[in-house]
């Protein structure tokens, strides 16, 4: 509970208003409920968990069912599929590998996968894979690619549409391969490296790539057209969209990324900063490693419209930031994520010590998520 003295404090809120009294826990709950309850009704979402990080402290809220058939409610321990929010874990793990001196973003991809002998891979660097700028790698790896030999065949036969760095085209097949190659020098699998280097140091004890048997009871059912679904296995799924987590762990993830000064492992601290560095500018958005950033303050339309698939999945000109700009505290840092039966959104403003996690067991339009998050955080200014 907040101390009463805190409720009387004043904080500067330059972006939305001049001054506002610090919010009480009840006021925060009211703000969140007024946005999330109608959202769930409009989008027919069975269950949601939301965390708000306000003045650096997390507040948790849950609604509805994690499993309709068995009448299991959503709790603070419920595991949700994060979808592409998993890419932020990939980016931080890659940043950690850079900080350890194991890889460089300027390294050619072929250094870590010499079997990629096709001419099209000459000139493509790890940076391009990590930031979707390799030249037009597709959004998804085809379903018929089921093993490493088929994966190599897929990449060997891919032909770029543009020169590396010309355009950004969002792609699981791009950042997914980055994640797989970034851990090669460690000698560990991607899952092992993620667990040892990121999840365990940050005490994310309920965040998984493979949900263990004893945690299955907390694994929510996702829903698509009213039917329960879980994500299907696929090549590079762990790297691109395969993480599952609870609202408590995701609040901790936001806190660590918002202010890494409390992270004890120096390479992880540096990795978090590298993931929020600015490598390319695409319109008013900056591409990090997994994370995407916009300058703060900003207008709601720029993030809401930018999250629409027509924009987010479009091939857009990329302007390289060279050298990359270090993380900027006055940023809206965010990532959307979806699987067949889940929809997630994470956003934070480091300068304001303010953030939000929204986890749902149904996928629903990204602009709706972003607008809801904006409305909540705007009122907490």
UniProtKB/Swiss-Prot annotation:
Q: Which residues form the active site?
A: 84 (acyl-ester intermediate)
Residues making up the signal peptide according to the UniProt record: 1-20
The record's GO CC annotations read: outer membrane-bounded periplasmic space
Protein name (Swiss-Prot/TrEMBL): Beta-lactamase CMY-4
Please state what class of enzyme this protein is: hydrolase
Query: Which residues are noted in the entry as a beta-lactam-binding?
Result: 84, 140, 170, 172
Record-linked Gene3D superfamilies: DD-peptidase/beta-lactamase superfamily (3.40.710.10)
Please give the organism.
Klebsiella pneumoniae
Q: Which domain of life is it from?
A: Bacteria
Q: Which family does it belong to?
A: Belongs to the class-C beta-lactamase family.
């Amino acid at each position: 509970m907040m101390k009463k003295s805190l409720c009387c404090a004043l904080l500067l809120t330059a972006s939305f208003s001049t001054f506002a009294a610090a919010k009480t826990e009840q006021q925060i709950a009211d703000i969140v409920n007024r946005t999330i309850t109608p959202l769930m009704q409009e989008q027919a979402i069975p269950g949601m968990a939301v965390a708000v990080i306000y003045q650096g402290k997390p507040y948790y809220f849950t609604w509805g069912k994690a499993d309709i058939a068995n009448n299991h409610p959503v709790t603070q321990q419920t595991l949700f599929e994060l979808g592409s929010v998993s890419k932020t874990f990939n980016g931080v793990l890659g940043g950690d590998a850079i900080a350890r001196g194991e890889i460089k973003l300027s390294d050619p991809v072929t250094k870590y996968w010499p079997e990629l002998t096709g001419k099209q891979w000459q000139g493509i660097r790890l940076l391009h894979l990590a930031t979707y700028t390799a030249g037009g790698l597709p959004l998804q790896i085809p379903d018929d690619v089921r093993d490493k030999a088929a994966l190599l065949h897929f990449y060997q036969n891919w032909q770029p549409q543009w020169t590396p760095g010309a355009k950004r085209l969002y792609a699981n097949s791009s950042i997914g391969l980055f994640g797989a190659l970034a851990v090669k020098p460690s000698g560990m699998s991607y899952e092992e490296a993620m667990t040892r280097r990121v999840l365990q140091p940050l005490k994310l004890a309920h965040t998984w790539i493979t949900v263990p048997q004893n945690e299955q009871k907390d694994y929510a059912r996702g829903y698509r057209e009213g039917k329960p679904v879980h994500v299907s296995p696929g090549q590079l799924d762990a790297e691109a969209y395969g993480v599952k987590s609870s609202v408590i762990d995701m609040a901790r993830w936001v806190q660590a990324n918002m202010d890494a000064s409390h992270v004890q492992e120096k390479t992880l601290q540096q990795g978090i900063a590298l993931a929020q560095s600015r490598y390319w500018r695409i319109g008013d958005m900056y591409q990090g490693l997994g994370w995407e950033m916009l300058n703060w303050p900003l207008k709601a339309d720029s993030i809401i419209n930018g999250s629409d698939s027509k924009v987010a999945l479009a091939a857009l000109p990329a302007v390289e930031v060279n050298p990359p700009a270090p993380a900027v505290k006055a940023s809206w840092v965010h990532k959307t994520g979806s699987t067949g039966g889940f929809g997630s959104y994470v956003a934070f403003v480091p300068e304001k010590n303010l953030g939000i996690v929204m986890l749902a067991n149904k996928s629903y339009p990204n602009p709706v998520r972003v607008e809801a998050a904006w409305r909540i955080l705007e009122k907490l200014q």
